[in-house]
From Swiss-Prot:
The lineage of its organism: Eukaryota, Metazoa, Chordata, Craniata, Vertebrata. One of its GO terms (cellular component) is PML body. Its main location: nucleus. It comes from Homo sapiens. Phosphorylated by PKC. Phosphorylation is increased in presence of forskolin and may enhance the GDI activity on G(i) alpha subunit GNAI1. This is Regulator of G-protein signaling 14. It comes from the Eukaryota. Residues 302-373, 375-445 form the RBD domain. GO terms for biological process: cell division; chromosome segregation; G protein-coupled receptor signaling pathway; learning; long-term memory; long-term synaptic potentiation; mitotic cell cycle; negative regulation of ERK1 and ERK2 cascade.
């Protein structure tokens, strides 16, 4: 009708497809508040999600972008997601998740089937000789002895880690991939979806005709018609042999999982900011296989696994040129930790790391952070203030023990209190109760405090002489400390005199010798009677034994002079 406004032929609900990237993983509604947590394990216990603005029966592809749980509930969506992970060489994650789903459906009474399926899952995904190993942290490692008593929920923690990894890492890239955009376009145009795996990832409609070439012309090496390439290709667009595919899947998967699949612990407290860098590793690998995605991100560096004091973990990018202190500053600030009160250790090592060295030494390493409680201690008898650092689990008496032993005191001879207060503090309290405070240590009347013999920086701070404290706070070297010797040896040795040393060398070179009697001359050297030969007289002074006996004072005199000089 001329007077009737025209209506665009867009069915109700199509406009919701134009959403931003941030809206793909966030939903609204009272029922969808728990979807983004990634704590669901089984597809049968996944939440139903929020009420969709469009019917999911008519538009299943659009509903995949609502949440990762909705994608797993759709068999077709799960198949396309599996095909997407194959291109990223991480299909073993979803395969392991589906195997755990089937394993949980086995009745607990069927012990024979449980034992058989548990061994199959363990040997394929979890053992050290697994063909398709999944990347889980050490806390979730399982030994082969657990197979003796199989339970339907024995792989619950491992499945949760892989679920969180796929949700926060792979799913975010899937909803932005050309494969998903192609499915959305086909659904909007009313075309049927092709079977997953029938065409190359991100290819256009399979009905597109092959471009005609002039006689004698051919496509460049590695360029074939889109939609007709095999699922896995080698260099030049040729399909890989099965043996090579298995080798590629073993080596490439192991390398990519170490760098891009950082499922760290069961609490799933991953820093998504770092995982954004990790994803560029697989992006660049897809570019080398002929992917049609956009510009690749800059080449990422290696990563360091950081275990925080609260038991969670995070990934830190070990960028060249940054110190360990700079690398950990962002993580500590985000978690509300004070970096000066943090000690950094390699996992399995009790020696603290120096934070001023380059962070590339921690590439592909695991470190743990331990928090330290610091407070100031004022020694009124010595008129000194020291800074004490101790573990949060230690008590005040344990933290003060090095200071007390250093000055020859016992806990019964001192009183600890806050400035301006007379009420003494209980030495059995934890040091966390006096964090960042200043305390006063007084001695009882009649108790004399002795000055410490050892004035090293470590002991003056009240910390025990441990290797990690020496490595973290190296004592400053002063010129006097380079030549300073213990007080017990000062009376026995003297500083070497340069002029005396030069004179000594000159006398040795001139074949002279000294002892306590002065200069030894040739006329003064007389052999004792038991060394003289019976047939020789006084002329035996010039015999070789004379030279030998004369040479003895040289060595002895030289040694004695050197000892006295040193």
């Amino acid at each position: 009708m001329p007077g009737k406004p025209k209506h665009l032929g867009v069915p109700n609900g199509r406009m919701v497809l134009a959403v931003s990237d941030g809206e793909l993983s966030s939903t609204t509604g009272p029922q969808g508040q728990g979807e983004g947590r990634g704590s669901s394990l089984s597809i049968h216990s996944l939440p139903s999600g929020p009420s969709s603005p469009f019917p999911t029966e008519e538009q299943p592809v659009a509903s995949w972008a609502l949440s990762f749980e909705r994608l797993l509930q759709d068999p077709l969506g799960l198949a396309y997601f599996t095909e997407f992970l194959k291109k990223e060489f991480s299909a073993e994650n979803v395969t392991f998740w589906k195997a755990c789903e089937r394993f949980q459906q086995i009745p607990a009474s069927d012990t024979q089937q449980l034992a058989q399926e548990a061994r199959n899952i363990y040997q394929e995904f979890l053992s050290s000789q697994a063909l398709s190993p999944v990347n889980i942290d050490r806390q979730a490692w399982l030994g082969e002895e657990v197979l003796a008593e199989p339970r339907p929920d024995m792989f619950r923690a491992q499945q949760l880690q892989i679920f969180n990894l796929m949700k926060f890492d792979s799913y975010a890239r899937f909803v932005k991939s050309p494969l998903y955009r192609e499915c959305l376009l086909a659904e909007a145009e009313g075309r049927p979806l092709r079977e997953p795996g029938s065409s190359r990832l991100g290819s256009p409609d399979a009905t597109r005709k092959k471009p005609k070439l002039k006689p004698g012309k051919s496509l460049p090496l590695g360029v074939e018609e889109l939609g007709q390439l095999p699922p896995v290709e080698g260099p030049g667009g040729r399909p890989l042999r099965k043996s090579f595919r298995r080798e590629l899947g073993g080596t490439a998967n192991a390398a990519l999982r170490r760098e891009s699949q950082g499922s760290l612990n069961s609490s799933a407290s991953l820093d998504l900011g770092f995982l954004a860098f990790v994803s560029s590793k697989s992006e660049s690998h897809r570019k080398s296989l002929g992917s049609t995605e956009g510009e690749s991100e800059s080449r990422p560096g290696k990563y360091c696994c950081v275990y925080l004091p609260d038991g969670t973990a995070s990934l830190a990018l070990a960028r060249p040129g940054l110190t360990i202190r700079d690398m950990l500053a962002g993580i500590c600030e985000k978690r509300g930790l004070s970096l000066p009160d943090i000690k950094v250790y390699l996992v399995g090592n009790e020696q603290a790391l120096v934070l001023d060295q380059d962070c590339t030494v921690l590439a592909d390493q695991e470190v743990r952070l331990e928090n330290r409680i610091t407070f100031e201690l004022e020694l009124t008898a010595l008129e000194r203030v020291v800074r004490i650092s101790a573990k949060p689990t230690k008590r005040l008496q344990e933290a003060l023990q090095p200071i007390l032993e250093k000055h020859g005191l016992s806990p019964l001879e001192v009183v600890l209190h806050r400035p301006g207060e007379k009420q003494p503090l209980d030495l059995g309290k934890l040091v966390s109760s006096v964090a960042a405070q200043r305390l006063v240590l007084d001695t009882l009347p009649g108790v004399k405090i002795s000055k410490a013999r050892d004035k090293s920086p470590c002991r003056s701070q009240g910390c025990p002489p441990r290797t990690q404290d020496k490595a973290t706070h190296p004592p400053p070297a002063s010129p006097s400390s380079l030549v300073k010797v213990p007080s017990s040896a000062t009376g026995k040795r003297q500083t070497c005199d340069i002029e005396g040393l030069v004179e000594l060398l000159n006398r040795v070179q001139s074949s002279g010798a000294h002892d306590q009697r002065g200069l030894l001359r040739k006329e003064d050297l007389v052999l004792p009677e038991f060394l003289q030969l019976p047939a020789q007289g006084p002329s035996s002074e010039e015999t070789p034994p004379q030279t030998k006996s004369a040479a003895q004072p040289i060595g002895g005199s030289l040694n004695s002079t050197t000892d006295s000089a040193l």
